[in-house]
UniProtKB/Swiss-Prot annotation:
Family: Belongs to the bystin family.
One term of GO molecular function: snoRNA binding
Name listed for the protein in its UniProt record: Uncharacterized protein byn-1
UniProt lineage: Eukaryota, Metazoa, Ecdysozoa, Nematoda, Chromadorea
Gene: byn-1
A cellular component annotation (GO) from this entry: preribosome, small subunit precursor
Domain of life: Eukaryota
Comp. bias intervals (Acidic residues): 103-124
Region listing for Disordered, in residue ranges: 1-58, 71-125
Residue ranges, compositional bias (Basic and acidic residues): 30-46
GO-annotated biological processes: rRNA processing
């Protein structure tokens, strides 16, 4: 038996009719359900019949009119009490009383009158009233500030505190501060790591040392004397690029210079990584001369081996002219040692166009040794020869005469004739070159770093 499908929800099941009746029913359209038609008409009638009766609408309008009148009276009383200036009153228009025989068109007209009845209100205050009101206001009222103002004020306060702290820091003083035991332990562990360092990344905590106020205290917690040569190279790179010249000079004098001298003294040569650190140190020329070269010479214990190794960096790396001139002048004013001649010759051979004061200072360095009874070493004669070869055109007649007199007292059987030949050589107009210069806008009298 075939299963019969229902046509829709709520279909009634009917018994099977005879075949002839089914055929007749299929020819004629099925009539719609009378019950559904009745329900639909009832819903439509209920929707169309929903309206407010005339009696109820009149009551609503009367109540609304009373409320508006009460509000208008209250507003008028308050305005008359607070201000002596008469103000225009708002009009509340609801039209005449609504009656049962009025149509909906009359109600629409009344609504338009309600909208047009309210006019803009212009308020004028008497200056005396304003003055009286101002007397009751707080004179020290707190000004409202936005979130941006609060954050900006905090940022400026932090910046001012940081600038004040940095301005009070003396680079020549060792800043001691109380430190957290955990911080001390961390940097001691970093020191152990640097004592075994060969290659790779440096700890981030070590990289921030140059930015700290008490950087010297933290640095010595890592025990720099135990660092490997590769660690010293990385530290020199870091400090030379992130510190100002004064702080960098302290690092060179306290950490780098002792390590370089110890390595040369122990192994009679300089480790490759330490030599690279020495080359990187010249990134700050003023700190290089004032933190390495000048302290080395002023110590009085600089050996020729150390002088040759340190001066070799000067011949390989370009140096600013005025830093070179200032260094030459400072070295020339020192008490003579063999190491002084090594550094002076290295700077002279760079063939820089030096200021006249630097050239005069080097010449006076040689002339004042005329009365010295010691036999001058070959390094001294070679340095004097280099000076005459490079800057003979900048020497005046008095200086040349003084040099002639000097080589009579301190002569060398091979070098002194060469010095005399350089001074006596005739300069043609084509070959004459003036090497010393005067820089516009800068005083050459003050030879400072």
């Amino acid at each position: 038996m075939v299963k019969r499908n229902l046509k829709g929800r709520g279909d009634k099941l009917s018994a099977n009719a005879p075949l002839d009746n089914q055929l007749e029913a299929g020819k004629v359209a099925k009539q719609r359900d009378e019950l559904r038609e009745k329900q639909k008409r009832k819903r439509e009638d209920s929707q169309t019949d929903e309206f407010v009766p005339d009696s109820l609408s009149s009551k609503i309008l009367n109540e609304a009119r009373k409320q508006l009148l009460e509000e208008a009276l209250e507003r008028q009383e308050t305005e008359s009490a607070t201000s002596s200036v008469p103000k225009r009153q708002r009009g509340a228009w609801l039209g005449a009383d609504a009656s049962g025989d009025k149509s909906d068109d009359d109600d629409d007209d009344n609504e338009e009158e309600d909208d047009n009845g309210f006019e803009d209100q212009v308020v004028e205050l008497d200056p005396r009233d304003e003055a009286d009101l101002a007397r009751f206001l707080k004179k020290d009222a707190i000004q409202m500030s936005t979130l941006y103002d609060i954050i900006q004020a905090k940022i400026e306060a932090k910046q001012n505190d940081a600038e004040l702290a940095l301005s009070q820091v003396d680079p020549n003083e060792f800043n001691m501060r109380d430190m957290d035991p955990e911080v001390v332990e961390m940097y001691e562990q970093i020191g152990q790591y640097m004592s075994k360092y060969r290659s790779g990344k440096v700890p981030k905590a070590f990289k921030i040392i140059p930015k700290m106020i008490n950087w010297e205290q933290i640095l010595f917690l890592t025990k720099p004397e135990t660092w490997t040569a590769a660690a010293m190279y990385q530290a020199t790179r870091l400090f030379a690029s992130n510190m100002n010249p004064k702080m960098c000079q302290r690092f060179y004098t306290l950490v780098l210079l002792p390590r370089l001298r110890d390595d040369i003294d122990e192994f009679k040569k300089l480790n490759y990584h330490l030599y690279q650190a020495l080359c990187k140190a010249i990134y700050k020329p003023a700190a290089f001369f004032k933190g390495l070269i000048l302290p080395l010479l002023e110590s009085g214990t600089c050996t020729l081996r150390e002088a040759v190794i340190f001066s070799s960096v000067l011949t390989k790396v370009p140096i600013p002219i005025f830093h070179s001139a200032a260094a030459m002048l400072r070295i020339a004013e020192m008490e003579y040692t063999g190491a002084n001649s090594v550094f002076l010759r290295a700077l002279i051979d760079k063939k820089y166009a030096l200021p006249y004061r630097a050239v005069d200072g080097v010449v006076n360095h040689f002339i004042r040794l005329k009365t010295d009874e010691r036999d001058m070493p070959v390094l001294w004669h070679q340095c004097l020869l280099a000076l005459c070869q490079r800057y003979k055109n900048d020497l005046n007649a008095e200086q040349k005469a003084a040099i002639y007199e000097l080589i009579r007292f301190h002569g060398h059987y091979l070098i002194s004739p060469e010095i005399r030949r350089e001074l006596e050589s005739k300069e043609t107009e084509d070959g004459h070159v003036i090497t010393s210069v005067v820089v516009e806008g800068r005083k050459t009298d003050s030879m400072e770093f």
